[in-house]
């Protein structure tokens, strides 16, 4: 699962990691067959963000610095978000490890094994999915 479109991925991941249950509610348009359809946010410290950007390019992440009114978007923790367009993420665990090994990366939007239940809204219908 990829989260962090609202730029609070560090906070969300901290809460998810200490929760007994992580229940996510989504619209069916967020469901994909392959991770990478939507950009993967990577939270980075402002100092040296360009170096991290270059490292993300070397991982074929096709990165974009997320902007707000022409300036880097700043998270509640004072960091920047770089959105990576990997197209297909075949091995999320490996990618998460590679991202976390880059000096300057604070967190990434891969929420691996943190969601225990997902509620999917499709018009008037709700579907509950438990983690497999």
Name these PLM-found stretches.
Residues 1-132:
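Conserved phosphate- and dinucleotide-binding cores of soluble alpha/beta proteins
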């Amino acid at each position: 699962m990829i989260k962090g479109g609202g730029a609070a991925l560090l906070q969300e991941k901290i809460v998810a990691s200490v929760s007994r249950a992580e229940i996510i509610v989504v619209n069916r348009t967020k469901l994909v067959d392959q991770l990478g359809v939507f950009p993967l946010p990577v939270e980075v410290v402002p100092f040296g963000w360009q170096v991290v950007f270059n490292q993300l390019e070397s991982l074929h992440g096709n990165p974009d610095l997320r902007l707000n009114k022409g300036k880097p978007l700043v998270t509640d923790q004072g960091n920047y978000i770089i959105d990576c367009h990997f197209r297909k993420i075949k091995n999320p665990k490996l990618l998460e490890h590679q991202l976390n090994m880059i000096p300057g990366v604070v967190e990434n939007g891969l929420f691996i094994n943190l969601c225990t239940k997902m509620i999917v809204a499709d018009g008037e219908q709700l579907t509950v999915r438990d983690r497999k």
